UniProtKB/Swiss-Prot annotation:
DNA-binding region: 201-220
Similarity comment: Belongs to the autoinducer-regulated transcriptional regulatory protein family.
One Pfam family it belongs to: Autoind_bind
Gene, per the UniProt record: raiR
Single GO MF descriptor: DNA binding
Keywords: Activator, DNA-binding, Quorum sensing, Transcription, Transcription regulation
The protein, known as: Transcriptional activator protein RaiR
Species this protein is from: Rhizobium etli
């Protein structure tokens, strides 16, 4: 990726802060379509990428531009507790459990809320097939009880969205070559697609007339090819068969 492309892509703002989960995750719930769930969405690859460093990260955001500018100008990457936890771990980081009530982090979160960033938030670490890393965040201004329920109901959709967005960002930015992606066999692809549609291993083996162990082997083989650790990550890998 050339420096000019990295520079163009490093500060891309998505449109509209009034987001609904139905818009991003295909919710079929009428209440979900009528009531805003999220305040902002943010995607960032702050490190371990050619052309994207801590000082020039790959970002797609709906945060207020004034907050984004202040975040970058004051190098908040270095004190943001969510970024620090997300870099080290694999599990979602709930903002309320990220130690934001201590020291500089408290002032950081209070300042973020003053700029209109949601008071609730969860950040999902993403690990790509070529070792790249990114963080995907959604925020909300709903009360604690509502936010907890939304988070439980929507976590799977948010994980799928996080990995899909990461995959597209890597390809469209030129940081990952499509030709470099692994090719899946027909059976591997079938097992992945059925799993993505919610079928269990027993149901897949009945449809394909193969054993449960064979289904598990095909999924494990696909995970190795895509170099991912979980089936959720696997389902967002390249859909190409031999």
């Amino acid at each position: 990726m050339s420096p000019s492309h990295a520079e163009q892509f490093s500060f891309f703002l998505l449109s509209g802060p009034d987001l609904r989960i139905a818009d991003i995750a295909g919710s079929g719930n009428d209440a979900g379509r009528s009531r805003p769930h999220l305040c902002d969405i943010a995607y960032g690859s702050p490190c371990d990428l050619a052309g994207a460093t801590d000082s020039n990260p790959l970002l797609m955001l709906t945060y207020p531009p004034e907050w984004v500018k202040q975040y970058r100008d004051r190098d908040y990457f270095s004190i943001d507790p969510v970024v620090r936890l997300g870099r080290r771990g694999f599990l979602p980081v709930e903002w309320s459990a990220s130690g934001w009530d201590s020291g500089r982090a408290y002032g950081f979160f209070k300042e973020a809320m003053a700029f209109g960033v949601g008071r609730q938030g969860v950040t999902l670490p993403v690990r790509g097939p070529q070792g790249e890393r990114s963080l995907f965040t959604v925020t909300s201004n709903h009360p604690d009880a509502y936010w907890r329920q939304f988070r439980m109901d929507s976590m799977r959709d948010l994980q799928f969205l996080a990995h899909h967005l990461h995959d597209r960002a890597m390809v469209l930015s030129g940081m990952r070559k499509v030709a470099d992606l692994p090719r899946l066999s027909r059976r591997e692809l079938q097992c992945l697609e059925m799993t993505a549609n919610g079928l269990l291993a027993k149901q897949i083996c009945a449809r394909l007339s193969i054993s449960v162990s064979a289904v598990q082997l095909y999924l494990a083989s696909a995970r190795r090819k895509l170099t991912v650790a979980t089936t959720s990550e696997q389902l967002l890998g390249p859909r190409r068969s031999n």
